[in-house]
Amino acid sequence: SDVHGNITALNAVLNDIKNRNINKIICLGDSILKCTHPDLVIDKLREVCDVVLMGNCDYAICRPEVKDRKFWTRHLIGEERSQYLLSLPKSYEFHMSGHLIRLFHASPYSLDEVYNPMFSNKNNLKGDSEITNPDRLFENTEFIGKTQNDPTPDIVGFGHIHTPFIVRHKNKTIFNPGSVGIPVEMLNCDENDTCNKFSTLSSYIIIEGVYNSTQLDSISFQLVRVPYNIQKEIIDLENSNLPTKER
């Protein structure tokens, strides 16, 4: 999830995935914005992912009402990629080892409403509205095309907050793979740049089980952290004409 135009980090994660012989890849949105290669990231995700979901940044830059604004990212990715991002689904679900797993970018209510079990003012960097009751993550909503007659998930996964975690809630599971492109530890470095060697590790989650099976079987979750050449991405950023690169 949350590659945010960081092609260097994406390639490192995809290489790790390849080495583990993982056979299905799902991206939870926010392919673009913040880093310098949104075009390459979109193309790579289209090539390797089985499913790509829409994120709030994808929608914000590509929505029709801002088409005429001179957004750097939208100009770079072009109209065809913009339309592709707008066509992405808001959720995806499947059975694995007898569990119904539902995925979305932020919540079943919107692209930017957040739940964070480790929530603090420091973590809420975007000022998004907060979900305080995790039960809401399992609800069927019109936003994701569900009715009250549809089955509710046993497991939900989402991105957006760049904070990797796996937690249990009332015999159900909530997980967040963190961010490939901008790990939360990097965002939380203080003004004195007191980061450590783990601050720039990309993250993703592996779910292992019997895909598309409604029969109860073993299932596991593994959080993976992957180093990448951040200096290359910094050089690309410094050499770009990205208006917000000083941030």
Stretches with model-predicted labels:
Residues 3-86:
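Core catalytic region of metal-dependent phosphoesterases/phosphodiesterases
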Residues 17-22, 96, 149-152, 206:
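Glycine-rich phosphate-binding loop signature in dinucleotide/nucleotide-binding domains
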Residues 90-98, 167-169, 207:
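Short acidic-hydrophobic surface loop/beta-edge motif
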Residues 127-172:
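Hydrophobic, aromatic-enriched interface-forming segments
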